[in-house]
Structure formats: C-alpha cells, structure tokens
Amino acid sequence: DFHCLPGWSAYDQYCYRVFNEPKNWEDAERFCAKQADSGHLVSIETMGEADFVAQLISENIQSEKHYVWIGLKVQNKEQQCSSEWSDGSSVTYENLIKLYMRKCGALEQESGFRKWINLGCIQLNPFVCKFPPQ
C-alpha cells in the first residue's frame, strides 16, 4: 500500500496531479520534474489509466481550457541538420520551423480529455504530472 502527497491522486502505483497554471510543453515537463524524483508529464499506458486521467482532469480543470499537455512528443530523429551554413553563418530560421511544428501531445476537451492531439509546443496549456511514489 502506498500514499501520494496531499493534493495528488493515486492510481495503479503512481501519483497524479492536474496543474491549471498554463505553461508551454517544455516548461510543464520541467515543472513536473521538480515536483518529485522521476516526475514527468503524464504518460498514458492503458485504457484504465486513460479513463482515470480523463476523470481527474474533468474534476480539476478550469472549464474554459480546451487542451491539457501530456508527456507525448514527436521526436525528429532523422532530421540531423548541422547547426551552421557552409559559409559559417548560423541557422536561425530552422528554430522557427520547429516552434510551429505540431510536435507536442495534449488531451482535448471535446473528447472528454480522452483523445490525443498534436499541438505546437509553445502553446500555453494546463498539464498533468505523474510520478512513482517516493
């Protein structure tokens, strides 16, 4: 038997919490890591966990929020570009493309926070953290 910290909810050996303060994906992931050892944006590995997380969000979210970050990120492994042009000038616009690519995962309100959707990582959204009990 294990216990989560006050304010956190337990499901299947993990602790979960919804945070309403909007952050971009990277900041949300960093925030989760600071909450506890092995803390991350939530991973959803079973249908039961998906139902639990959807319920938790529905009970804790501010109603006008449409998306909630989860720990899903599209990694571009095959695009290993060098970071400067052959004339030595630095690559600046490549970062802009990355910022606006829809690479980060969220749950959407219209599906009752069950359907995954890809959003631009710089969007500010509430998020769910998950960690194994300490």
From Swiss-Prot:
The keyword Disulfide bond applies. The keyword Secreted applies. GO terms for molecular function: toxin activity. Keywords: Disulfide bond, Hemostasis impairing toxin, Platelet aggregation activating toxin, Secreted, Toxin. Residues 1-134 form the C-type lectin domain. Its main location: secreted. GO terms for cellular component: extracellular region. It is found in: Secreted. It comes from the Eukaryota. InterPro entries: C-type_lectin-like, C-type_lectin-like/link_sf, C-type_lectin/snaclec_domain, C-type_lectin_CS, CTDL_fold. Heterotetramer of the subunits alpha, alpha', beta and beta'; disulfide-linked. Potent platelet activator that aggregates platelets via both GPIbalpha (GP1BA) and GPVI (GP6). Induces a tyrosine phosphorylation profile in platelets that resembles this produced by collagen, involving the time dependent tyrosine phosphorylation of Fc receptor gamma chain (FCGR1A), phospholipase Cgamma2 (PLCG2), and LAT. Belongs to the snaclec family. This is Snaclec alboaggregin-A subunit alpha'. The lineage of its organism: Eukaryota, Metazoa, Chordata, Craniata, Vertebrata.
